[in-house]
């Protein structure tokens, strides 16, 4: 699975490291980028299961970011899907959204994936939706699953960090909300962010909007880059991986 952050701007006023929008005239180019990236990764031995078209598409301040409302993503998936199929990559899933349960409190973006599924052509190419837990509640997935139970749901990002270092509480709450909460609502899998960071919370982008206080699932000591400390997300993932069988 991979998520993308890009900054291809729509006009001069959007010429920024953050919050630009993708020109419709660049849809073919962006789709070709996906094709070439997947081909290179597979050549290196990585089997790409799924992609999202933009990480946190409603986040104007991410590092780096591109604003991609559902209206834009609805049109781009109609270009990306055929491009992947033409390149023999039709088995790579395309997941919509990849953002928070509360749609970043943007009223016009509520039901983001459902709005895209309502378009017959977009529906054909969209395999499911991806979700983060930085805002809103996992119960948002109830409607998403009930309305389109045939479409996949993946949880694709949550972080731990300095803002709440309580190991026990994070361990229990995250397993309850992220793993059990999504899987019982049709979830197909969980990805946590990041897998590993060092004891200085890096590496991270120096640009505004990057997380400089996040922990990895594992912390590696920067003095030797050998000694590791297992954090709550490591134990969450280890437990789920031990008891959930592939294909379940």
Predicted regions and their residues:
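Substrate-binding cleft and catalytic face of glycoside hydrolase catalytic domains
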Residues: 1-119
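Solvent-exposed loop/turn segments at secondary-structure junctions
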Residues: 1-5, 54-60, 99-103, 132-137, ...
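A structural motif
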Residues: 46-48, 126, 187
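Hydrophobic residues within beta-strands of alpha/beta enzymes
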Residues: 49-51, 129, 190
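Substrate-binding cleft/loops of secretory-pathway carbohydrate-active enzymes
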Residues: 99-127, 138, 147, 163-171
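Aromatic/acidic polysaccharide-binding cleft in carbohydrate-active enzymes
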Residues: 152-244
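Surface beta-strand/loop "capping" patches
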Residues: 247-248
